[in-house]
Regions:
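Active-site histidine-anchored catalytic micro-motif
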Residues: 1-52, 57-58
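Conformational coupling and interaction surfaces
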Residues: 26-28, 45-174
Length: 174
């Protein structure tokens, strides 16, 4: 039995592919709707938190210049994100790491209980994640979903760096 699903995607306060929708949910809102309606408790790691889970240009350069192969590879990938997807090219958000970081260090994040849904109709709202914070409108067991609303950037960065450098340490232990 699946106890919960922790996923990267969605946004409570506006999207990145349209004003309303975040890319992952927008790409297939019907599939997201199936998951959202599954009854399995969801933890949404959306843009509200993932945009705060980033690396700075200087941190990325440090990774790229490292003698550690894992660090260099991570630096190259983050550098690609910085140059191609970061409008002002000062930070690169590391969206995909957030669910893992949340599972290991939930204390790095603020959360809020919500009722999640997704807009599947055509039009400007297609793919928008609907986060209903109005607990008084739902039965207690309906408010099973949570969203990450904020993140401790500094703690995220420090732990991510430690994890990246520990990859080579683990390899050397064999």
């Amino acid at each position: 039995k699946i106890r919960k699903i922790v996923f990267t995607g969605g946004a409570a306060k506006g999207g990145n592919i349209t004003p309303a929708a975040e890319f992952n949910i927008y790409a297939d809102p019907e599939a997201a709707k199936i998951v959202f309606d599954s009854g399995i408790p969801l933890i949404m790691c959306g843009l509200d938190a993932t945009l705060k889970c980033n690396l700075t240009r200087n941190q990325i350069m440090k990774l790229c210049q490292s003698g550690d192969p894992a660090a260099r590879a991570c630096g190259d990938m983050a550098g690609y994100v910085l140059e191609n997807f970061s409008k002002y090219r000062c930070v690169a958000s590391i969206h995909a790491a957030v669910p893992f970081m949340y599972l290991i260090h939930p204390e790095f994040f603020k959360t809020e209980k919500v009722f999640l849904d997704v807009e599947c109709s055509d039009g400007a709202g297609r793919g928008a994640t609907l986060c209903d914070f109005r607990w008084w409108l739902h039965e207690e067991d309906e408010m099973k979903d949570m969203i990450l609303t904020d993140a401790d950037t500094e703690s995220f960065q420090q732990e991510l760096f430690e994890a990246i450098y520990s990859v080579s340490e683990c390899k050397n232990m064999k």
